């Protein structure tokens, strides 16, 4: 049986400095629980088969949508983006601590491959 223990999420954020590079904390029901530090602009993308959940632990995350709408996600808030909706996460220059729940097959850049794409995620 797997060891059952609590995870200090803020402590996990202290273990890495890379931005836009998700790290895996655990898995459940075919999904990964990931943490990621975000800063400045990410790529426009969508996820054809998966909804995406953003949960902000520190800072303020901005999510732009193609209809010119921007949603602000503050500390302690979540935002769920339905599959197929094109979006671009960004910050106003601050480092934002974010938690994600996504199917194991989800690529963080969705339908776009760029220099920001990370295919082999590290466990922390």
Please name every model-derived segment.
Residues 83-112:
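Ligand-binding loop in jelly-roll beta-barrel domains
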Residues 18-19, 32-48:
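Conserved short histidine dyad/triad with adjacent acidic residue
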Residues 1-34, 115-124:
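A short, N-terminal "cap"/entry segment at the start of jelly-roll beta-barrel domains
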